[in-house]
Amino acid sequence: MKILFATSEAHPLIKTGGLADVSGSLPDAYHHLKQKVRMVMPAYGDIWEKVSGVKQLSELSIAACGRQLHVRIHVASAEGIDVPIWLVDIPELFHRPGNPYLALDGKDWWDNGERFAVFSKVVAEIAMNRAGLKWQPDLVQTNDWQTGLVSALLTLEAERPKTVFTIHNMAYAGLFPKSLFEGLGLPWSWWEPHDGIEFYDNMSMLKAGIQMADWVTTVSPTYAKEITFPEYAYGLEGVLIKRLDEGRLVGILNGIDHDVWNPKTDPFIRYHYSVDKGRVAAKKRNKKDMLDFWDLPKAVVDADDPVIGLVGRLVPQKGIDLVLEVLPELIEQTNVRFVIVGTGDSLFEYQLTELAHQYPERLMIYIGYSESLAHKVEAGADLFLMPSRFEPCGLNQLYSLAYGTPPIVHSTGGLSDTVVNATKENLATGQATGFVFYDPSRHALKSTILHALHLFSKKGTWQKLQKNGMRQDFSWTRSAKQYLALFKAMV
C-alpha cells in the first residue's frame, strides 16, 4: 500500500509536542511492515541543517488569499527517519525564526491559518498526483488541525485516495476568521455548522478533518470515547458523536521508539539492564547516578529511600497543582523523595522552587527540559508520577513501564488503557503494572502514593510488578499493524 503521511512536525527535525514523536516513528513502522511510505511536511528554516541528500523534485503554484505562491518540493533524508521526506518549501510562509506555530514573542504567527491551509492545498495536490512527483498514494493520513483541510479538499476530487485524520489533542482547534475561508476560495456549502467546517462564525481546521475524512482515529481507545463528551470535546462533541455512530471513529494507542527508550541500550544511563538481567542492581546504581546530578550528600545518595520521579510540563492539565498540595505532607509523613523535571506556569515553577529550598534533600527539581535527565529519571526513580487531568495517550507512562519504574497515573485517556492498577486481585493474577487513581483530587492522589510506597516495601511483590510492566508490548510495530488493518479494510 502507498501511504502519504502529512504532518507539521517530526522528531528529530522539529518538535513542539507528542505529534513529532508519532511522526518520527509511525511512518517508519509502516515502512518496516513493507508499505510504501512518504512523509510530507513544511520546510521550516531550521530544518535544512538537520537533513541530507536534499534534491528538488518539482515546483508548482498555489493560489491563496489573493496571491499566487511559488512552491518547491524537495526530497531529503534524516538520521532516525527511514522513509523519504518531502519538504514543502514556501519561504514566505515557513522560513521564519521561532517554532512552527509561534513567533519569538511567544504569540501565534498572525498568518498561521494561511500557512497551514496552503500546506494542506499542496498535500492535496500531491495526493492527486498533480505536483509533478509521479506518485499517488492509496491513502493519506493527516494529523491535527494543521492538516485538517486535506481531507476536506480531497472530497472535491474524483478518483481520490482514502483519508484518515488522526487527532492527537482536541485542545487545539485551528480556529480562523471567515475572511480566511473566503480568501482560500473554499466552497460556500462548507460554511455551515452541521455538515461543514464553520464553528461559531469561525472556520475550524480541526473540524474539517473530523467532519470530512473517511475515518477518524485518535491516540488511545479511552480518549476516543472521552472526546464524545463536552468536557473533552471543546464544543465538537456533536460531530464526534456522529462519526462514532457511523463507526468511523476509533482509538489506536501510540507506541514508543525502542531504539530511543530501552534500558538495555540507552546511551543516557550508566547501567544497562533488562527484565531478566541485572535489573535490581542496575536500578539502584542508576538511582545514585540520577541523584548525583543535584550534588546531594553521600548519605542521601546511598540511602534506599523510595524516589518518585516526574518529568513533564508544569501546567494544570498535568495535575501539578495536586502534586504541590500533597508534597509537603508526604515529605513530612514518609521517607519518600521526589525528583521533578519540567517547565511551565511560572507560579508552579516558583512554588516548586520554594518547596525545594524548604526540603533540600527530599525534593530535587530542575526547571527546564533535559533529554539526558529525563532518561536518568526513568531509569533511576522507583516510581513515576503522572497525575494528568486529561491525557490523549501519554508517553512517559510507557517509558516508565519499559524501564521497570511503575507509574502512578490518573485514570484518563491513554493512561487508562496502558496501566493496570495494583489491586489485590490484579496482583494475584499477575496483571498489575502500576497504580491508578480515579478522582483528580489531593486525597485520591495521596492515598494512591501511600499504597505504592507500601508495596515498594514488599520486595517480592514489587519485583513482580516491575517485570509485568517491562514485559508489555507498546512498540510502534504493534500500533502500525492496527492502523494497517484499518487502512486495508478501507482501501
Curated annotation (Swiss-Prot):
The keyword Transferase applies. The gene is glgA. ADP-alpha-D-glucose binds at K15. Synthesizes alpha-1,4-glucan chains using ADP-glucose. One of its GO terms (cellular component) is cytosol. One of its GO terms (biological process) is glycogen biosynthetic process. It holds the Pfam family Glyco_transf_5. Keywords: Glycogen biosynthesis, Glycosyltransferase, Transferase. CDD domains: GT5_Glycogen_synthase_DULL1-like. Pathway: Glycan biosynthesis; glycogen biosynthesis. GO terms for molecular function: alpha-1,4-glucan glucosyltransferase (ADP-glucose donor) activity; alpha-1,4-glucan glucosyltransferase (UDP-glucose donor) activity. This is Glycogen synthase. It is an enzyme of class 2 (transferase). Its EC number is 2.4.1.21. It comes from the Bacteria. It catalyses: [(1->4)-alpha-D-glucosyl](n) + ADP-alpha-D-glucose = [(1->4)-alpha-D-glucosyl](n+1) + ADP + H(+). Belongs to the glycosyltransferase 1 family. Bacterial/plant glycogen synthase subfamily.
